[in-house]
A protein has these predicted regions:
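Noncatalytic alpha-helical scaffolds and linker/capping helices
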Residues: 38, 393, 430-491
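Intrinsic disorder/low-complexity segments
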Residues: 397-430
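Phosphate-backbone binding interfaces of nucleic-acid-interacting proteins
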Residues: 1-195, 199, 307, 332, ...
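Conserved catalytic alpha/beta cores of large enzymes that bind or transform nucleotide phosphates
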Residues: 123, 226, 294, 300-397, ...
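Glycine/proline-enriched, intrinsically flexible loops and inter-domain linkers
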Residues: 4-5, 23, 63, 182, ...
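Conserved phosphate/anionic-ligand binding catalytic regions in large, soluble enzymes, centered on
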Residues: 2-3, 7, 81-89, 163-182, ...
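Conserved mixed alpha/beta core segments that line enzyme active sites in large multi-domain catalysts
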Residues: 47-76, 235, 252-321
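Terminal amphipathic helices with adjacent charged low-complexity linkers/tails
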Residues: 178-211, 384-398, 430-444, 448-451
Length: 491
């Protein structure tokens, strides 16, 4: 998994060199496989505006461009890029400019025509490719602006997260852990659910296999405008290795990497009736978003419509036919919980994986289902417009089996379920604790050899989001994202 340090910095601030920063990540149990620094080693590269273009007389694929670079006269630059047009703003590396990797650009001739620099792609500046060809910059920039003022310096970290820590498979989750490790403050994602209405799904969503998909939420958003995402959103996705597609799809991918909540958007016009989750018919086929056709069997879970047509492979990948396109005006946003073993089996049998299946296989927190949906709806209304329906809820999440069997702790009335009954109307939420774990202080003394005081132990657990039960200082309430904490030794 790739993480952006600049993105992580939205939630916690750790002023340390990259090496020490990555060392802190390893204390979470994750393995840092490497990191790379972006946006450095760039000199004499500016924003250029293409004023005129003409065909190169000695080449059938090259262009001679006159480029405004903020000086009294435009400069002539020859390029072979095919995605540039008059009026575009692009990075222009001028004579004696320096690019990452020790590359120096000087003036010269290309097939007999003078070129006083080079127009650059994102990758030539040491950045992830934002599009095929030259990097087309936002129109609000001024020609001559140093590209170093446009590019955000960032460190991209490649991390392997252990299977028992699915809570770390997002920027928000890793930032929470880093804040606890470093003792720094944590700034949670602001999610306003005060006006969110929950309603029973009724006939709109039917769960035919609740043992594989016990919990499903859907929101219909009408009147959206599918278009290119704003620059900030595209930059976030590019930083973690994703290709921006359109604002709707990009928002679902953004929320997955922000909160760890897998989401999917269907074109509502391609859904007949409502949603049905069921096992596939033997030999049923579906063309997925990767363009490949897959043959399913009766153990695979599909999301279908009420006509029987399969729309998606549950928890793995959506179908191409029901996907969001530029012509889409209404969408159905899915946020659900799928059984990890079911997703894992289907993904492996089909040799088909996705960022969503990677998280579902390891176990997502059902508490995040609603949070992710609310966050995505908020962003869609901001960036695509439209009107949202209530959140339709089918089924109910199943408590973590380990927590469901916990005995009462101290004066409490047994395990607290994250799945307190959903209330209809405004501000509908779920309880924030999964259950209790008892940690006798004598057990801490035995494990740590007395090197951790009871006060320090309590401070660490509190920083990790656990809460002491009133009047029972050895009993701790587990936060909903920590599915791995079920026994005293886990604490």
């Amino acid at each position: 998994m790739k993480l952006s340090r600049e993105w992580l910095g939205e939630y916690t601030t750790i002023g340390a060199p990259d090496k020490e920063y990555c060392d802190a990540m390893t204390l979470s149990g994750s393995k840092v496989e490497g990191y790379e620094v972006e946006g450095t080693e760039i000199e004499n590269v500016v924003v250029g505006k293409v004023l005129a273009m003409e065909r190169h007389p000695n080449s059938d694929h090259m262009w001679i461009c006159q480029v405004d670079v903020g000086k009294s006269e435009p400069v002539q630059i020859v390029t072979g890029a095919q995605n540039v047009h008059v009026g575009d703003l692009v990075p222009a590396a001028l004579h004696k400019s320096h690019l990452p990797g020790g590359v120096t650009i000087t003036k010269g001739k290309l097939r007999g025509v003078e070129s006083r620099g080079m127009l650059c792609s994102a990758s030539e500046l040491g950045l992830p490719d934002k599009e095929h060809g030259l990097w087309i910059l936002p129109q609000e920039l001024e020609p001559g602006t140093p590209i170093s003022q446009v590019v955000k310096a960032d460190t991209l970290v490649e991390v392997e997260v252990t299977p028992n820590r699915p809570d770390l498979l997002s920027h928000n989750g890793m930032a929470y852990e880093l804040a606890a490790i470093s003792g720094r403050g944590y700034r949670p994602v602001s999610i306003d659910d005060a006006g969110v209405a929950l309603e029973p799904a009724g006939d709109f969503v039917r769960l035919d296999q609740p043992e594989l998909n016990p919990y499903y939420t859907a929101v219909k958003i009408s009147g959206v405008k599918v278009q290119e995402s704003p620059e900030w959103l595209k930059e976030r996705l590019v930083a973690v290795g994703l290709r921006p597609i359109n604002n709707i799809v990009d928002i679902t991918n953004f929320v997955l990497h922000e909160l760890g909540t897998p989401l999917h958007a269907f074109d509502a016009a391609k859904v007949q009736g409502g949603i049905v989750t069921r096992t596939a018919y033997e030999g049923e086929t579906i063309k997925a978003l990767d363009g490949q056709e897959y043959t399913l069997n009766c153990t695979d879970l599909v999301v279908a419509d009420q006509s029987g047509k399969a729309l998606a492979i549950g928890g793995v990948m959506g179908g191409e036919e029901s996907g969001v396109t530029d012509a889409t005006t209404d969408i159905i946003l899915e946020s659900a919980w799928f059984k990890p073993s079911s997703v894992r089996a289907t993904s492996r049998r089909l040799a088909l994986s996705s960022d969503s299946s990677y998280r579902f296989e390891r176990g997502t927190s059902a508490w995040n289902v609603l949070r992710g949906s609310v966050r995505a709806v908020e962003l869609i209304l901001q960036l695509a417009g439209g009107t949202a329906s209530p959140t339709y809820v089918a089924g109910s999440p199943v408590p973590n089996p380990a927590h469901a069997s916990m005995p009462s702790c101290g004066g409490a009335d047994g395990p607290v379920s994250v799945f307190a009954s959903l209330k209809q109307g405004k501000g509908a939420t779920v309880t924030n604790e999964l259950g209790f774990v008892q940690l006798p202080w004598k057990a801490l003394d035995q494990i740590s050899g007395g090197s951790i005081s009871h006060e320090e132990g309590a401070r660490i657990l509190t920083a990790l989001g656990l809460k002491q039960v009133p009047d029972s200082p050895e009993c701790w309430l587990i936060p909903p994202h920590r599915l791995d904490l079920t026994r005293p030794c886990d604490l």
